Amino acid sequence: MDAEAVVGTRLASQQLRAPLAASAEDALKNLLAIQAQEYPYACWSLGQRTAGATADDVGQAVAEGRILRTHLLRPTWHFVHRTDLPWLRALSAPRVHQANAATYRRTGIDAAAAARGDGVLAAAVAGGRHLSREQLASELQHAGFAASGLALAYFIMHAELNGVIVSGAPVRSASGALRQTYAAFGERVGPAATTPLPKDESLAALAARYFRSRGPATVKDCADWSGMTMADVRLGLALALEDNPAALESTEIDGVPFYFSPELAQPSSPGFPAGDETDPAGRIDLIQCYDEYVMGYSASRGYLGGKGPVFPYNGDPMHVILLDGRMAGAWRHRILRPGSRGQTCELDVRIWQDKTQSAGLDDAVARYGAFLGMPTTY
């Protein structure tokens, strides 16, 4: 498999090319989890993998708890579908607690404090209450904890990892910005919250779904993405192949096995796979800098054609422009007259490759504007 085929197959596996997902939920189920610390852009990561989901569609799924936002895996904020969160949280939590141990000690969160903090937060969100971070801080402080700054963040993360709390319905601040809330894990997840999987079964599911949605990729890519050990990923991969030997194939590149779904393999141009109309200018995609097309890989991220996330201009964060699956520039958006009936979106676009033509960029900007549901220019 050459570099062009790797890039094309990744685009297809990640549903950045047809066949696209029917909904944002389906896109998320394919990817299992996506990095989501920048909420509006994470919503776009899901929307652009569908046949037409809008920001409002994704926002409704988040508000209703079908898509949940929480800390797990490396750890950082992730979107996870509520049917996957129970087993993925149970698999990930011990590794994250281990990684957090030094910070727990530094912030005074020993075993007793952590258990009591979990109890305080569980009581705070009981009965269907959705509370902001500031409200959770007030509850912890009322119980005698010095819960601010880093300590507050780790009390909340501890409760997330233990299946006590998870994202609630976002609320709008006075400025119009959406703000995270927290709710009871069991109430948001539902019956699946009480159905844990054996670890081996979870590892097999993790490996099968990671390599199907991000292949071709390496064991190290999966280990770094998931926070699991290389040994656990190898075990999960072996179990997944034992259960379904035809689900994944491998190819060796520079002596390293890359695993992928054979039904998604793309030998043709990554811009326009066989069956699509070919555009000599190439296909442009606007992806967020934490998109899974970037963050889903570590050892083999070089196929992106540049380093991501992108912070190229005066230290200001920018997102990634792809030309046929390879980095070709950077972008960010600005909402003008937010909250008004005449709000519009203006993109700051920096193209690095002279061969990029405006038609492809016009199409990409139009897709983004359709997702936002507002006029969008650059």
Question: Model regions: which residues?
Answer:
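Long, low-complexity intrinsically disordered regions
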Residues: M1-V294, S298-S300, G305-Y378
